[in-house]
Amino acid sequence: MTKYSAHLPLSRRGILVGTASLLVLSGCSGLIGPSGPPPQIYVLQPEFHAADTPPVRWQLAVAAPDASESLDTARIALHRGANLDYFADARWTDAVPMLIQAKLVEAFEKSTKIPAVAATSDAVRADYVLETTLRDFEARYDSQNGAPTVVVDIVVRVVSEGHSDVVATHDFHNEASAARNDIPSVVAAFNQAAGAAFADIVAWSLSVPAAEKSGSATPVATPPARRHKTAS
């Protein structure tokens, strides 16, 4: 049997190799190229206002929240019945725990009641640390086609920086109904529910150290995790 490829001129062998390479790349184009339109990126943008509390003299470091793997993502979560899923082709600008940390820092800054606040990664000289656990940050559907209710549930702990003692703990649960069953309306509901949660967290946190020093603060045990009701 004649082995043609072994005796072909170099130029022709190059053509065959090049043609084969093009065929391989053509067959893989669906794998290495874009599979569809890029996801729409949405900004978490709640409104912040000055807190209706007395100013404080201590400084605060805000830790990134603990979160389950299902919430530690930039995807926008939805809950229908017993199923946790995500909106297609929609993303937050960052993973949800990082967004929560950044927005809490911003909320304390815009409260105008605290001299210094920063993320723990910024190595601020803090008197207290705000630790959080993110339990819910999702759009919850009670019906197949109706507009969802956004649920934000954050457990907050104020911790003494010097002794690492938990001064107080509170569970903040906020909800907001979307006006319509579309992504912009759902994002608006996230902004509303998250904004209310941040405002409550700021007001409560600013009052805790003063209560601790006066002896009236009562540390509260972290409440048990909420169990989602499943559709019957």
Language-model segments: what does each one mean?
Residues V56-W58, D72-A74, R80, A88, ...:
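Envelope-exposed proteins and targeting segments
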Residues S29-V43, E47-A51, S111-G162, T230-S232:
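Surface-exposed short loop/turn segments
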Residues M1-S26:
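N-terminal secretory signal peptides
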Residues V105, E109-K113, A139, V202-A210:
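Sec-exported extracytoplasmic/periplasmic mature domains
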Residues S29-M98, V208-S232:
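A structural "domain/chain start" motif
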Residues I76, L84-R91, G162-A203:
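Short secondary-structure boundary motifs at beta->alpha junctions and helix caps
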